[in-house]
Each structure stands twice: as C-alpha cells, then as structure tokens.
C-alpha cells in the first residue's frame, strides 16, 4: 500500500512540475529572451541583442502609465477591503446553516465570463443606464452624469470583478479566530474598538494581505476593463502590453513591459511572505 501511495505521489509531483515547466517557466523564458531582441518589421523581432527595451520603460510616458495603474489598482484594492472585511466578518458570525448560501453567492459571478460582466457594467453606468435613471427618478440628480470613459468607471469595474477575491481569504482568516481570545480581551476590560484593533485585526492580517495581493496584482493587467469602461483616456499596464503586441507589433518592448510587470508582482509577493512571516512570529511571541 505504501509503495502504491509513493508511486502516486511521485506521478502527481511529476505532473505538477511538468505543467509548471511547459506552461509557466518556458513561456516566461521565451518572453524574457524576446525582450532583449530588436524590433523587426517583418518578423516582429530580430538580432542584435539590446537593453534599449528596458531603458524605454523609464520613459516619462510609460512611467505615468505605471503610476496610473498602481494608483487605480490601489484605490480598487482599498475599496474592496472596506467592503469585503465587514461582509466577511458578517459571514463568519451568522448561523452556520446560512454560510454555504452566502459563499455560493460570493462565487456565483465566477460562473459568468468577466468580459460579459464588464459589458453589463458598461450598460449599467451609461448616460442612459440604470444607475443614472435610478438617481434621476429618486430626485438625487436633475440630469444624467457621465461616468463612462473615466477613471472612476475603471475603478468601479475593477471592484466589481475582484471583490470576491478579497472576501474569500478574509472569510477564511476571520473564521479561524479563536473566540476564547476575544472573551479574554473582554474580561480584561477591552471595549469593542480595542478588541478589534488589538486582537481581531492583527490575527486576520494574513488574510488582509492575501486579499490585497489577489486584488492588486490582477487589477494592473485587466486591459479590457480600461478599454470598455475607460475608453482611450485611461490606460493600465495591460493596455500597453496589448497595444505593443497587437497594434504596434513591437514584441521586444511588449515583452520587456511584461517582464517588468512580472518582476513587480514577484516583489509584492515577496513582501507578502515576509510580512506574513513577521506577523506570525509576532503573534507567537505575544
């Protein structure tokens, strides 16, 4: 029986590593290699080797796009956290009988393609859309306001798509809280705010960091959200990559932008693991 289990484990590990090598490592190495080549009109890329593609990343135009991507993704992440934390906390405190239903409602949007959902959001936010019509009927607005083709529309779209990715890790972290710690804090005279900021918040920080990463990292590359809700006025890093590959046909520079985004994501993941390790050590010491 042990021999069978060992063989099964080896086969499973081999399949996983093979998948990672062929579909993650090799494609990224190819992109890295192309990023050091020169643009060619007929073959997309050619020799000689150059680092000009990476020096172009520091062009003020592209630096502004990176800053816009970080700022809009950061704002969307903060909004997701402010909405997701109370919702996840509520989910963990209701009767266990109703939790599966709420979890089902959280993951239900994943059953529909995100592109179709963004088209629906475009209709919702339009000048003659549901939102403007509802606000006018309620007397809040006297005339429709333009939300589409603005940064606000892009942020709304990012929050709409990525909110479940914030709720799920937060719910997992909050559900694991030891109620005895909260009772002990209450017995020691801690009020509601003190219990939250000194007990609940530190213990759920790994879930907060994980949720922020799961929202922030994909948000920077969702070019179709900026295309449909922001028009030509709002650009994310993903829009630059798409444009360089499909429109400008500058594959080397598009590859360099992709590698730059990958490095940025890797740094953020490294920060997450370091912060998570330090938080766990702090909790153990306390």
Curated annotation (Swiss-Prot):
PROSITE patterns attached to this UniProt entry: ABC_TM1 (PS50928)
CC annotations in GO: plasma membrane
Bilayer disposition of the protein: Multi-pass membrane protein
Single biological process term from Gene Ontology: transmembrane transport
Entry-linked InterPro entries: MetI-like, MetI-like_sf
UniProt entry keywords in alphabetical sequence: Cell inner membrane, Cell membrane, Membrane, Transmembrane, Transmembrane helix, Transport
Residues of the ABC transmembrane type-1 domain: 66-274
Topological region Periplasmic: 34-71, 121-151, 220-252
Cytoplasmic side: 1-13, 92-100, 172-199, 273-286
Any Pfam family the entry gives: BPD_transp_1
Subcellular location: Cell inner membrane
Transmembrane domains' residue ranges: 14-33, 72-91, 101-120, 152-171, 200-219, 253-272
Family per similarity comment: Belongs to the binding-protein-dependent transport system permease family. CysTW subfamily.
Role according to the record: Required for the activity of the bacterial periplasmic transport system of putrescine and spermidine.
Cited NCBIfam families: PRK09497.1
Name of protein: Spermidine/putrescine transport system permease protein PotB
UniProt organism field: Haemophilus influenzae (strain ATCC 51907 / DSM 11121 / KW20 / Rd)
């Amino acid at each position: 029986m042990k021999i069978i289990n060992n063989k099964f484990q080896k086969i499973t590990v081999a399949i996983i590593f093979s998948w990672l090598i062929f579909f993650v490592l090799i494609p990224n190495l190819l992109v890295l290699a192309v990023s050091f080549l020169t643009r060619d009109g007929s073959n997309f890329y050619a020799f000689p080797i150059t680092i000009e593609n990476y020096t172009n990343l520091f062009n003020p135009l592209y630096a502004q796009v990176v800053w816009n991507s970080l700022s809009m993704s950061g704002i969307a992440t903060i909004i997701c956290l402010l909405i997701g934390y109370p919702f996840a906390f509520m989910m963990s405190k209701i009767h266990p009988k109703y939790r599966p239903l709420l979890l089902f409602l959280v993951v239900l949007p994943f059953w529909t393609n995100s592109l179709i959902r963004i088209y629906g959001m475009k209709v919702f936010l339009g000048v003659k859309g549901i939102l403007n019509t509802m606000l006018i009927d309620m007397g809040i607005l006297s005339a429709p306001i333009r939300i589409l083709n603005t940064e606000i529309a892009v942020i709304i779209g990012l929050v709409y798509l990525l909110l479940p990715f914030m709720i799920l890790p937060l719910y997992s972290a909050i559900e694991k809280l030891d109620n005895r710690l909260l009772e002990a804090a209450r017995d020691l005279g801690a009020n509601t705010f003190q219990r939250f900021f000194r007990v609940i918040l530190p213990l759920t920080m790994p879930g907060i960091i994980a949720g922020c990463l799961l929202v922030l990292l994909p948000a920077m590359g969702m070019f179709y959200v900026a295309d449909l809700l922001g028009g030509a006025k709002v650009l994310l890093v993903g829009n630059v990559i798409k444009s360089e590959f499909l429109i400008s046909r500058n594959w080397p520079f598009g590859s360099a932008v992709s590698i730059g985004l990958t490095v940025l994501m890797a740094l953020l993941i490294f920060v997450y693991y370091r912060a998570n390790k330090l938080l766990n050590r702090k909790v153990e010491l306390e």
